Amino acid sequence: MAGLPRSGSTLLSTLLNQNPRIYSGPSSPVLGVMYSTHDNFISNELYTGYPKPDQVNEIIGSVIEHWYSDIDKPVVIDKNRAWCARVPFIEGYIKQEAKVIVPVRRIDEILSSILTMIKRNSFQEGQPRINFVDEYLVKNNIPINDETRCQHLLSPDGIVWESLNATKLGVEEGHSDKFLFVDYNDLVKDPQKELNEIYEFLGEEPFEHTFENLSNEHREDDITTYGLSDMHEVHSELKKVSTDPSEILPDSMIELYNSNKSNLEFWNVSKSVKTVTPIVTSPVPIDPSSKTYNLFS
């Protein structure tokens, strides 16, 4: 599972875990460990002096198996927002076609959700850290307000930009047929329908879910990791409770969203056609050696 923040991935995992065949946990370090292990071997002169690629492939590929060695379920869903940008990498190790569930949501709703969460989690004496957004602003001597928060979230160092970029890269590389986009508002409106589509995508039999008394059984240490105590909290009843973004976002951010909506929310196009309109008119890498694109024209 990949996708965008504040787009229902935790809710989706909570629902999928009702199915006795499925384990869907919190964000995992699996991809990062696999990638860094790969890079460490490639850059190690002892390895380049006497390479053993088959053994290295076995070592890297075994990370998934060992990380989930405590899980006895036939279907395991790993969560990392970078999976969309690493499809060929993971397919080289799992030896089968990747299938990535991609939760998405209107970008203005994502931004307003994050701002709302920050405001209801004001810093308390004794907390290990302030929220991760304001922490970045403080470290970079940037004034803290809703506009700078949104600007950071939509910058290359922000989680919204990073997840959008990773997803876009996967689409641009031609892997959209391996992605199932799940819109947050569709999930809340008709959850069973969305779950049935996920089961069809995964090749699993449908499963009848319940949508009351929900609880995230795989809670992360949100206050230590993000400085936000309810980052991955799930409401007991499935319903949309968010406020209209126009009541929360600064006017400048609303204008920015409205003028870039079709570029930002590119998945609405990719659902129906394989070739999509790029995020910018002509996707130009920020760095010729890296695969990242500007989000705004």
Question: Where do the language-model regions lie?
Answer:
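Conserved nucleotide-binding/hydrolysis micro-motifs of P-loop NTPases
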Residues: P29-V30, R105-I110, L187-V188
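Glycine-rich phosphate-binding loop used to anchor ATP phosphates in small-molecule kinases
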Residues: I59, V63-F89
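Conserved phosphate-donor/acceptor-positioning beta-strand/loop module used by diverse small-molecule
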Residues: K79, I90-M117
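PAPS-dependent sulfotransferase catalytic core
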Residues: M1-D70, D221, L228, S297
